[in-house]
From Swiss-Prot:
Residues reported to bind S-adenosyl-L-methionine: Y35, G60, C61, S62, D83, N84, N124, R191
GO MF entries: carboxyl- or carbamoyltransferase activity; S-adenosyl-L-methionine binding
Reactions the enzyme catalyzes: prephenate + S-adenosyl-L-methionine = carboxy-S-adenosyl-L-methionine + 3-phenylpyruvate + H2O
Protein's name in the database: Carboxy-S-adenosyl-L-methionine synthase
NCBIfam families xrefs: carboxy-S-adenosyl-L-methionine synthase CmoA
């Protein structure tokens, strides 16, 4: 379905409810620049470097796009998805079933999730929705539960520290969304709904959190304006 949720002024803060779940795939493909290309980059990289029967857990898996892509690349992967939205998980499970894929899903608040050890954790556009006081604790849990030589892939919307640059990057991002078919009204309405819900950090703040969690080797593997993907390795 086409995302037309913000053609009217929002009556509540943004949440991943049934209305969002029904249009999520269209929404994210039109709202996150190079979403599919970045998903495929990360998936192909993991498929290339991970050993047989590696375990991958997507934290904030939404509609399972990344897990489904991985499952079709490598049949040996053990795949898990966690999300706090029952509506999003309903979509994820339906898609996985339609493709005949064996993916285990868990409905849970990530800050209260009973973590298990994995070779890879993925947090694509997830941390930005976690309340700031809880983010470091969550990253600490991720690091703790990664197996030796484990990997974290983390994609985030980011802030620029320079106010002038930040203003112009935000305007360019709005231009991008207009080119994807969103009106100025829809863009403004969604921004209003996301205020104090999606709270981005700067690149430096994200790197500091990763380092504090214990990661020593951290690289940026994708960036477009105010979107960036980091890969971090556990020793």
């Amino acid at each position: 379905m086409k995302d037309e949720l913000f053609k009217q002024s929002p009556k509540k803060q943004f949440e991943f409810d049934k209305s969002v779940a029904s249009v999520f795939d269209d929404m994210i493909n039109r709202s996150v620049p190079f979403y599919r290309e970045n998903l495929e980059l990360c998936g192909n990289l993991l498929a290339k470097i991970l050993p047989t029967n590696a375990s991958v857990c997507d934290l904030g898996c939404s509609s399972a796009n990344f897990l489904i892509f991985l499952a079709n690349l490598r049949k040996d992967f053990k795949l898990f998805g966690v999300d706090n939205s029952a509506s999003m998980l309903e979509v994820a499970k339906s898609k996985a079933k339609a493709y005949g894929l064996d993916i285990s899903f868990f409905e849970a608040n990530l800050c209260e999730f009973d973590f298990f050890t994995c070779d890879v954790f993925v947090a694509n556009y997830t941390m930005q929705f976690i309340r700031p006081p809880k983010r470091q604790e969550l990253l600490d849990q991720i690091y703790k539960n990664l197996n030796s030589k484990g990997i974290l892939i983390m994609s985030e919307k980011i802030l620029y520290e320079d106010a002038f640059l930040s203003k112009n990057i935000i305007e360019l991002y709005a231009d991008y969304k207009e080119k994807q078919g969103y009106s100025k009204f829809e863009i403004a309405a969604k921004r209003e709904a996301l205020e104090n819900v999606l709270i981005p950090y700067s690149q430096k703040e994200n790197l500091n959190m990763l380092e504090k969690a214990g990661f020593k080797k951290i690289e940026s593997i994708f960036k477009w304006a105010n979107f960036e993907t980091f890969i971090a390795f556990k020793d």
